[in-house]
Amino acid sequence: MEQQEKKKRKVYRRRRLQSKPTSSFPLDLASEILLRLPVKSVVRFRCVSKLWSSIITDPYFIKTYETQSSTRQSLLFCFKQSDKLFVFSIPKHHYDSNSSSQAAIDRFQVKLPQEFSYPSPTESVHGLICFHVLATVIVWNPSMRQFLTLPKPRKSWKELTVFLGYDPIEGKHKVVCLPRNRTCDECQVLTLGSAQKSWRTVKTKHKHRSTNDTWGRCIKGVVYYIAYVYHTRVWCIMSFHVKSEKFDMIKLPLENIYRDVMINYEGRLACVDKLYTLNNDGIRLWILEDAEKHKWSSKQFLARYVHNDLRTNTISKLTGVTHAGEFVYISTQYLKSFVLFCDPKKNRFRKVEFNGIVDEEFRLSNGVGRGRIYALYNFPNHCESLMSL
């Protein structure tokens, strides 16, 4: 892997040296500056010259930018209104504080593809998000404001369960599709960015069915999701290795876990203990230590899975964890613009309010109305991507 990276860097540097600059501005310096800019500024610079465009669209530059972008993450929200998707991005440094605060946001709207009715999203994986509506899969790059509708994986599959994975070694995204509510021993896989946008059949020795409410989680090149295995008749975690396209089965630490939430806790997969949460005031996380040995460890926290604020009559649910280790709570009925962050070890909550998401001015100017917004999608730890769909 290290030799591959060195080779790519040499090719990238040779290409820049062979190019004839239109000014005396050093290209190495230009690249370093571009790598530090937000994606909307980088996209604008593609129009400066053919040379600058070739730098920005170079695969090695894109991968390097995405690697650096992973340290400049944001909290992304979006909701659908008519044929538009309203998008709100809150940079990490705006909410990365030890106290309650107010934060500014970056917002925009995009026109939706015709197939985009009432979609189910994946998590944000290395800058991309997948939506699926019945048997239609739509890939979205919020940074580039691009949508890509993929060909249907199978005519006989009327509804799908969709996962998005990323291979950090080769820098490739892959979409994984399974038939919804059907037991099978194969899936369809499509590699994004390849010349041929076609599906491949990948077999698995574990005949299984994914749950209706499962949310996949991609961690370090492996996609995890909850499934029911046919031959053992038990619920388990299925893992899909994005690079090798190999499936494995991981035993659950216990049956009573929340099937609609899996989180990335300190770079490892974690499940929430449902029984412990219902019987106690806190949260117990089961953290995957060794997938091959089916080994899990547990941690208890005072923070609750659902936070009920009686003063504001709002209920917020645990949706993820920031890279700083804070639990992220999002309101289930969005009327006011705020997010709760919790230090789980100290059980200390702080509220960050965001002006401009569903405030009066925004509602009036966009015809949203005064009611609660129920289908507000949120994506913690979203990073920017220059990948063109």
Curated annotation (Swiss-Prot):
* Top-level division of the source organism's lineage: Eukaryota
Q: Residue ranges of the F-box domain?
A: 19-65
CDD domains registered for this protein in UniProt: F-box_AtFBW1-like (cd22157)
Q: Which InterPro entries match?
A: F-box-assoc_dom_typ3, F-box-assoc_interact_dom, F-box-like_dom_sf, F-box_dom
Pfam families associated with the record: F-box, FBA_3
Q: Which PANTHER family match?
A: BNAA05G37150D PROTEIN-RELATED, F-BOX DOMAIN-CONTAINING PROTEIN
Protein's name in the database: Putative F-box protein At1g47790
Species assigned in the record: Arabidopsis thaliana
